[in-house]
């Protein structure tokens, strides 16, 4: 039984969001670094630091919060894992779904690397749909 690193980072971010934690610590791999760069570029997280501890690298993410009248802080981050090791989901460039009419993003793994749905449509390439973020 293999380990699903993408599901692990999605679960870590979602759990930190529900508990209103400001930071999340996740293991650093090439896939997680690519996904975190997309989250940072799209504005879903504030800051990323790479931390080394006992010859292992970790990424420390600072989550982005917004003020809400009823609650003190509310995170605007919702994540959903789509393709998983037991059921891979692929899409060509014309059938990449739009999340909330373009407000959310789809992260894809393509032949040219991990990218958002907008980048994949511009380059006219499809790939494996990793997750939805809105």
UniProtKB/Swiss-Prot annotation:
Identification of the protein by name: Small ribosomal subunit protein uS8c
Entry keyword Ubl conjugation: no
Entry function: One of the primary rRNA binding proteins, it binds directly to 16S rRNA central domain where it helps coordinate assembly of the platform of the 30S subunit.
InterPro entries hit by this protein: Ribosomal_uS8, Ribosomal_uS8_CS, Ribosomal_uS8_sf
Record keywords, A-Z: Chloroplast, Plastid, Ribonucleoprotein, Ribosomal protein, RNA-binding, rRNA-binding
Protein location: Plastid, Chloroplast
GO MF, one annotated term: structural constituent of ribosome
Disulfide bonds: none
NCBIfam families: PRK00136.1 (NF001109)
PANTHER family: 40S RIBOSOMAL PROTEIN S15A
Top-level taxon of the source organism: Eukaryota
């Amino acid at each position: 039984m293999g380990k699903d690193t993408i599901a692990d980072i999605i679960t870590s971010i979602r759990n930190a969001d529900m508990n209103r934690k400001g930071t999340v610590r996740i293991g650093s791999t090439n896939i997680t670094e690519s996904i975190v760069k997309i989250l940072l570029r799209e504005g879903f997280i504030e800051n990323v630091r790479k931390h080394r501890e006992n010859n292992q690298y970790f990424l420390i993410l600072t989550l982005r919060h917004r003020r809400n009248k009823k609650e003190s802080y509310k995170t605007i981050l919702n994540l959903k894992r789509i393709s998983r090791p037991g059921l891979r989901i692929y899409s060509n460039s014309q059938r990449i779904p739009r999340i909330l009419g373009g407000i959310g993003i789809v992260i894809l793994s393509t032949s040219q690397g991990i990218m958002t749905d907008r980048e994949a449509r511009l380059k006219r390439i499809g790939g494996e749909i990793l997750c939805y973020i809105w």
